[in-house]
Amino acid sequence: MEITSAEFVISNTDVKKCPTGVFPEYAFIGRSNVGKSSLINMLTARKGLAMTSATPGKTMLINHFLINQSWYLVDLPGYGYARRGQKGKDQIRTIIEDYILEREQMTNLFVLIDSRLEPQKIDLEFMEWLGENGIPFSIIFTKADKLKGGRLKMNINNYLRELSKEWEELPPYFISSSENRTGRTEILDYIENISKEVYKNK
């Protein structure tokens, strides 16, 4: 898929105020500081489309970007930022859960995982919750350029092994790097193929 246009549409905290219409939505979510904004900018080839920050947990809104006048890329708040107070954590959880459970246009949720880390309990529990609620999702392992030699493959295999303990069938997954654009073609082609099916069935 070639990205010919990408524009910011709206930010809000209320799923009921999200854009109307039938365009499929592909949402991106992950723990704070997983590299979500950098990935979005890399996928869209728009350096400043999603604002990056040195401060984890900065994204606290549902951000809609219209891509190619045919689908929405949705930047969801990050979860699990330790320095956010309990009230703030509860607010973010409500925003995330309301969007995921209520937004009919959401076609696929991309869960971002830092490939440098061992499987984190918060990520595993979140994906388990998605499975329990029948939410279609895929995994994107980020920051692949930060690992040398066979470490990347070993980390991902460890993660898949951990997921296999709870899942009979593993979700699709992608390996990405915002620095060298690894995974860009695969992720965009995946979105394009799903969108074709969506429009074919309308």
UniProtKB/Swiss-Prot annotation:
Cite the Pfam families for this sequence: MMR_HSR1
Q: What are the EngB-type G domain coordinates in residue numbering?
A: 22-197
Annotated residues that bind Mg(2+) are located at 37, 59
Looking at the record's lineage, which domain of life comes first?
Bacteria
Question: In its keyword annotation, does this UniProt entry include Lipoprotein?
Answer: no
User: InterPro entries annotated for this entry?
Assistant: G_ENGB_dom, GTP-bd, GTP-bd_ribosome_bio_YsxC, P-loop_NTPase
User: Could you tell me the keywords of this UniProt record?
Assistant: Cell cycle, Cell division, GTP-binding, Magnesium, Metal-binding, Nucleotide-binding, Septation
- GO process annotations (BP): division septum assembly
Q: Identify the residues that bind GTP.
A: 30-37, 57-61, 75-78, 142-145, 173-178
Read off the Gene3D superfamilies from this record: P-loop containing nucleotide triphosphate hydrolases
Question: Which family would the database say this protein is a member of?
Answer: Belongs to the TRAFAC class TrmE-Era-EngA-EngB-Septin-like GTPase superfamily. EngB GTPase family.
Annotated PANTHER family: ENGB-TYPE G DOMAIN-CONTAINING PROTEIN, MSS1/TRME-RELATED GTP-BINDING PROTEIN
This chain belongs to the protein called: Probable GTP-binding protein EngB
Lineage runs: Bacteria, Pseudomonadati, Bacteroidota, Bacteroidia, Bacteroidales
